[in-house]
Structures are given as structure tokens and as C-alpha cells.
């Protein structure tokens, strides 16, 4: 399949490229997240000493960015391609440029520039040194060296690559409207466009996000998710006796943190959160994320070494 001819071929080419580099090619996380970084394969696995390599597509929702399907390149639901490499390889930029070449953007034929743009996620308590990648004057991706996630220092530092798939596909296909993207690589009656797949949903979710979402219910959902996250962290915490040295319930707790974050984004889109309240909500989600990150470090995947502790 030609990555210049279809959206799905672009994704499959990136899958193949990063699989060849040793990454586990994962599936999208089955929850509403604002960015690929929220996937536990990045947020949690960036913590602790254990090496980790993964790549995946993540549907991402940013309710405030909806434009009722009338904007050619701004969406409330879109796709990111995420790569996480821990420890950060010394040739991360070279690997990234190789991925561009694989999808048809030869760095020798295009003006590829890296513009310094440090990254931060206030709700995740995460930040890193980073650069935007511009191709012939258009931003197509970002790469970041994680310094902190969940308010916890990353040791070793992890390298993260984030591709904006729609924007990248628009560039390689040479179209100006995201809904005109060829999705399946066929022509004529067999052609399926991005608009055929997503335009109606984009219109309807814009109405939901800005007009119809029940704000009283959303407020309750936020509080419920916050309480459940804390309750699960408490329930799974290591016991004082030697029979339970590991945390037993990190991922379910982190799911509740993700839910709280998405509900906050919906409330923000509905315009019912003041500037002061907004900072309070961000702090509450960040507090949950930090607690989940700390709990993850008490698991085998987080790198806790029980043999050394017992010695």
C-alpha cells in the first residue's frame, strides 16, 4: 500500500517502520483521551527504570476544538501516532527522519526544520524538552525528551514522538481539506474519504460538546471519577505485612484519572468553568495522575525490585 495514496496506508507504513525498530505495536487505548500521551503505554511506562519501546495510533478528543465540521483542518476528534522509546536513543532524530522517508517525505527533497518548543501537560504533571518538526513550512509532528511525568522525574529519560496523522496525510496527499483525504486508497465508486467516515460524527459531537452535554451530570461524573480513583489506589496499596509488597490496582485507578480529565475538557467546552475553577480542576486531575504514577512505581512493571528489598 502506498502511504501517499491513503490514510490507512500511512498508518500501516508507520506501524511497519517502528515494528522493525523493535517497538511493540499496540492498539489504541479504549477510553476518551485528549492526546496519545494519556495512553498508559506512555504515561505510566515512561516511569521507572525498565526499558520500553511502543508505537500506536490513538484517537484523541479535544472538545473545545470542534468546529461543526466546517473547518478544513481543525477537529474535536483526530488521530495521533505515538512512539515512546525508553531509554531515549541517541539517534532519535535520525529514526524520526527515517520514518518520514518511509511515508514518502524524503528529507533530501523537502525543507525539514526543527523548531524548539518545549512540551507540557498540566493535567498529567508532565513536561519535556522538545521540538516541533516543520516540513516545507507546515508543522507535522513533535518530539520530546520527557523530564517529568505525573510530577515524577523520568530516569532514564524517555523519547516521545507524536505525529499529527491528519495533518501529515494532508501534506503527503496534497489536499487542503481534511475531509477530502483518501481513506482507503481506492478511486471512483470504491473510494472512501475521511469525510465519509468522520464528517457526520464531527458535526454531531460538536453539538454535543458545545450545546447538549448535561453539565450537572458531568460535574457528578468528575467527582465520582475522582473518588473512585482515590478509593482504588487505597484499596490496592501495599499492605504492612510481607504478603503484599506490590500495588495491586494502578491501571483501574488510572482509568478513573483519564475519565476525570475528559469530563473536565467537556465542562470546559460547555463554558461552565471559570478561570479560577479551571486551575482548580487541572490541579485535581494532576493530583490523581501523580498518585497513579507513584503507585505504578510500586509495581513490577514500574521496576520495583523485590529481591533487593528482601536482601
Curated annotation (Swiss-Prot):
Gene Ontology CC entries for this record: cytosol
Keyword Ligase attached: yes
CDD domains for this protein: GlyRS_alpha_core (cd00733)
GO biological process terms on file: glycyl-tRNA aminoacylation
The reaction(s) this protein catalyses: tRNA(Gly) + glycine + ATP = glycyl-tRNA(Gly) + AMP + diphosphate
EC number per UniProt: 6.1.1.14
Protein's cellular compartments: Cytoplasm
Domain of life, source organism: Bacteria
PROSITE patterns tied to this protein: AA_TRNA_LIGASE_II_GLYAB (PS50861)
Pfam families the UniProt entry points to: tRNA-synt_2e
GO MF annotation terms: ATP binding; glycine-tRNA ligase activity
InterPro entries: aa-tRNA-synth_II/BPL/LPL, Gly-tRNA-synth_heterodimer, Gly-tRNA_ligase_asu
Keywords: Aminoacyl-tRNA synthetase, ATP-binding, Cytoplasm, Ligase, Nucleotide-binding, Protein biosynthesis
Membrane-traversing stretches: none
Subunit structure: Tetramer of two alpha and two beta subunits.
HAMAP family tied to this protein: Gly_tRNA_synth_alpha (MF_00254)
Family: Belongs to the class-II aminoacyl-tRNA synthetase family.
Protein name, UniProt field: Glycine--tRNA ligase alpha subunit
Organism: Rhizobium leguminosarum bv. trifolii (strain WSM2304)
Gene name per UniProt: glyQ
